[in-house]
């Protein structure tokens, strides 16, 4: 039973990490095309190494 819970936890963390990665990729592409946000969110994409 404990192994099943650990597997669910690891799967959830991997899915959340993948979603964050794809979101940052899309945001980086948007900001590179000249898009801006009033909150300065495009400044975050300068940290991303790609």
From Swiss-Prot:
Periplasmic side: 28-50
Subcellular location: Cell inner membrane
Keywords: Cell inner membrane, Cell membrane, Membrane, Repressor, Transcription, Transcription regulation, Transmembrane, Transmembrane helix
Membrane-related topology note: Single-pass membrane protein
Transmembrane spans: 5-27
GO cellular component: a single term: plasma membrane
InterPro entries from the UniProt entry: MgrB (IPR020907)
Topology feature Cytoplasmic, residues: 1-4
One Pfam match: MgrB
Keyword Cell membrane: yes
Any one biological process term the GO annotation gives: negative regulation of phosphorelay signal transduction system
Assembly and interaction partners: Probably interacts with the periplasmic domain of PhoQ.
Role of this protein: PhoP-regulated transcription is redox-sensitive, being activated when the periplasm becomes more reducing. MgrB acts between DsbA/DsbB and PhoP/PhoQ in this pathway. Represses PhoP/PhoQ signaling, possibly by binding to the periplasmic domain of PhoQ, altering its activity and that of downstream effector PhoP.
Homology family: Belongs to the MgrB family.
Protein name from the UniProt record: PhoP/PhoQ regulator MgrB
Species per Swiss-Prot/TrEMBL record: Yersinia pestis
């Amino acid at each position: 039973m404990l192994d099943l819970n650990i597997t669910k936890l690891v799967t959830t963390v991997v899915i959340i990490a993948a979603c964050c990665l794809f979101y940052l990729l899309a945001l980086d592409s948007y900001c590179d095309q000249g898009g801006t946000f009033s909150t300065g969110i495009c400044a975050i994409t300068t940290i991303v190494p790609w």
